[in-house]
Amino acid sequence: MLSVVIPTFNESKNIRNLVAQIDVALKGVDYEIVFVDDSKDNTPDVIMEVAKEYPQVRMEHRKNGTGLATAVLDGFKLAKGEYMACMDADLQHPPIVLKYMYRAMESGADFCIPSRLIPGGDDGGLNWYRKVESGTARKIGQVMLPCLRKISDPTSGLFMFRREVIENADLQPIGWKIMVEVLAMGTYSKVVEIPYKFQQRTEGESKLSGKVTLEYLKQLKNLRKRYNKSNRYEVEIWSTERMMKGDK
């Protein structure tokens, strides 16, 4: 089974479309969607309505949530799947990519990371300020944590991995960069990167703020002291053609 963990905060306008697209992308796959919701609006009600149509949908509503990273971690704890994925609810991570991530996992990967920065990828859904901010965060992370240096897009929030990767990991996430935590503390030997095109947000509002940047720097400082220095891994980069091989 594949468990898709999705943290939500006031994303009511995107939920129905998101679930419908995931269902199409994962046709033929045994999957579940685990929403971990910190919303102040009617997002929980929308999720429960959608769950009547899609029984694969589950939700954990947190009245006193402590941010995206802890929401995802709670979702991992609830997940039943052999494979676990994380993605945003705002549709900037196109759900169809889940199909190709799953394909990479079935090929023998321990970790699959869609990248905006390899041939076939695109970060066009970011405005110029977000591109600078994202690039700076990526470079700082790679300087502070050697374990991130082989990964082209290590600060993304879109990824999939085998459950065993985090079974013995001491995850203490803060802020938003949950994949950085998993890469630094997990155990894995093969990473597959696949290209994807980051989309523009069409509904709802971005949740980024200056607080997110400060939390990220605090997270890096903490991880630098305790990341899994013994982990060794190889990275395999798939072209668009290889990724889509087998599509009808």
Regions found by a protein language model. Give the residues of each.
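A conserved acidic beta->alpha catalytic loop
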Residues: 37-46, 91
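Short, well-formed alpha-helical segments that are part of the catalytic scaffolds
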Residues: 11-25
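Hydrophobic helical membrane-anchoring modules
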Residues: 1, 144-149, 171-248
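Donor nucleotide-sugar binding loop of glycosyltransferases
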Residues: 11-14, 39, 94
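Short beta-strand/loop segment that forms part of the nucleotide-sugar
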Residues: 29-40, 60-62
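Cell-envelope/extracellular polymer assembly enzymes that use nucleotide-activated donors
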Residues: 1-3, 32
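Acceptor/aglycone-binding surface of glycosyltransferases and processive sugar-polymer synthases
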Residues: 60-78, 83, 95-176, 201-211
